[in-house]
Swiss-Prot record:
Any one Gene Ontology BP term: protein import
Provenance organism: Burkholderia lata (strain ATCC 17760 / DSM 23089 / LMG 22485 / NCIMB 9086 / R18194 / 383)
Transmembrane portions of the chain: none
Compartments in which it is found: Periplasm
Subunit-level organization: The Tol-Pal system is composed of five core proteins: the inner membrane proteins TolA, TolQ and TolR, the periplasmic protein TolB and the outer membrane protein Pal. They form a network linking the inner and outer membranes and the peptidoglycan layer.
Pfam families assigned: PD40 (PF07676), TolB_N (PF04052)
Family membership: Belongs to the TolB family.
Protein's UniProt name: Tol-Pal system protein TolB
Region (Disordered): 411-431
HAMAP family: TolB
């Protein structure tokens, strides 16, 4: 490795430790549109009895379906249609809708809401079932996301991710905020606020905890944050840098990158703290670990071959088997992320002076760039594997973008008015 290349990789490792731009706090709006030319036409009638509610379930469902890029919303008019109504499916088919949704929101004596709906196939002239959900003023949005998930799965055969959550870091003035939001960027909550950088959020498989790196003690330390209770605790505070936490599929272990002995190497720690174990034994820089979904492998970035590339090793470490190089397209590849089905590898490749998001088929080895942006970083798969969230630059600002994982459409920038946002992580399916 040339001195310039080695310095470049060391700069990358350093940038993984301090990466947050100035920003004004704002709502993230997630949009994924323009996916191919086979969008499914669907009409969602206004749900009965929701006109005066704090959240309009119908609007949430329509917005979810539209931003997925997989559906076209057919105008359903303004007349509410409850799930109990007799529906002329032929008439809706004639209007261009291949599916129709009817529903209602009813307030119960205890102050909660009962949200009911039915999904119809207008082509086959039959019901595709529905759900009856209980919600409160604060969970009506979640009910809407769950309805959209049901529709997505019934019509496309793939589980929807509308009811999942995102995490990301926003900086306001001299304050950093780790925020948790719905998958559409709405309903954002501040999990942690600090005057020191917060980086590398990583969701637990259950979706109830987030591991991250905080500099609040003037050095990078790995914390775990329990979202329901707000409790947080340190899991790695070793000598030097503690970075890049990644959960094992069983939630019992975190892989981390530590500079405990000089060069950054990969270790594991118990998710409750303690149990430190070294996995790599190289004189190079080994960093950015990520578990395969079956828990058998850890993918990571290393410059052991002369330049940064993606490798994988047994989850027990190199003592159980030599690390194998995985990426061969391009001379500088970092930030491995494996799709939930274990078939795809997303990573960042230095290309033509920029950095692009690539996706590689792990069976064939074929790899392709799937973005038209040039400062990509921090990829994160959606729980169904159909989309990737990542950080990039647009108009001189740090932004988030989303793109179909098959590259079938250009990436869409996620709108954050007046500010910058970094460090995205897409949460798992909620239990």
């Amino acid at each position: 490795m040339s001195l310039m290349t080695k310095l470049g990789f060391r700069a990358l490792v350093a940038s993984c430790l301090i990466t947050a731009g100035s920003a004004a706090n704002a709502q993230v709006n997630v949009l994924i549109t323009g996916v191919g030319s086979t969008q499914f036409p669907i009409a969602t009638a206004n749900f009965a009895n929701e006109a005066n509610l704090p959240q309009q379930v119908t609007s949430i469902v329509r917005a979810d379906l539209a931003r997925s890029g997989k559906f076209t919303n057919i105008d359903a008019g303004s007349t509410p249609v409850p799930e109990s109504a007799s529906v002329d499916l032929g008439a809706w088919k004639a209007k261009g809708a291949n599916a129709f949704v009817a529903g209602s929101v009813n307030r119960e004596a205890n102050g909660q809401y009962k949200v009911n709906f039915i999904l119809y196939d207008t082509v086959k002239q039959q019901s595709l079932g529905g759900l009856s959900l209980t919600a409160t003023d604060t969970t009506l949005r979640t009910a809407g996301h769950k309805i959209a998930d049901y529709i997505y799965q019934k019509l496309l055969g793939v589980r929807g991710v509308f009811a999942t959550r995102l995490s990301y870091v926003i900086k306001t003035g001299n304050r950093y905020q780790l925020q948790i939001s719905d998958s559409d960027g709405q309903n954002a909550r501040i999990a942690l606020s600090s005057t020191e950088p917060i980086i590398s959020p990583s969701w637990s498989p259950s979706g109830t905890k987030v591991a991250y790196v905080s500099f609040e003690r003037k050095k990078p330390i790995v914390y775990i944050h329990d979202l329901p209770t707000g409790r947080r605790y340190i899991v790695s505070d070793q000598k030097g840098n503690n970075s890049a936490p990644a959960w094992s599929p069983d939630s019992n272990t975190l892989a981390v990158a530590l500079s405990l002995t000089g060069n950054t190497q990969i270790y594991t720690v118990n998710s409750t703290g303690g149990g430190l174990r070294r996995l790599t034994q190289s004189s190079s820089i080994d960093t950015e670990p990520f578990y395969s979904p079956d828990g058998h492998w850890i993918y990571f970035t290393s410059d052991r071959g002369g330049a940064p590339q993606i490798y994988r090793m047994p989850a027990q470490g190199e003592s159980a088997g030599a690390a194998q190089r995985v990426t061969f397209t391009g001379s500088y590849n970092t930030s491995p992320r494996i799709s939930p089905d274990g078939k795809l590898l997303a990573y960042i490749s230095r290309t033509g002076g920029g950095f692009k998001l690539y996706v590689q088929d792990l069976q064939s080895g074929a790899a392709n760039a799937i973005t038209n942006t040039n400062r990509d970083e921090s990829p994160s798969f959606a729980a169904n594997g159909q989309y990737l969230l990542y950080a990039t630059q647009s108009g001189g600002r740090n932004v988030l973008a989303a793109v179909p994982s098959d590259g079938s459409a250009p990436p869409q920038i996620l709108s954050v008015q007046g500010g910058s946002v970094r460090e995205p992580s897409w949460g798992p399916f909620m239990q």
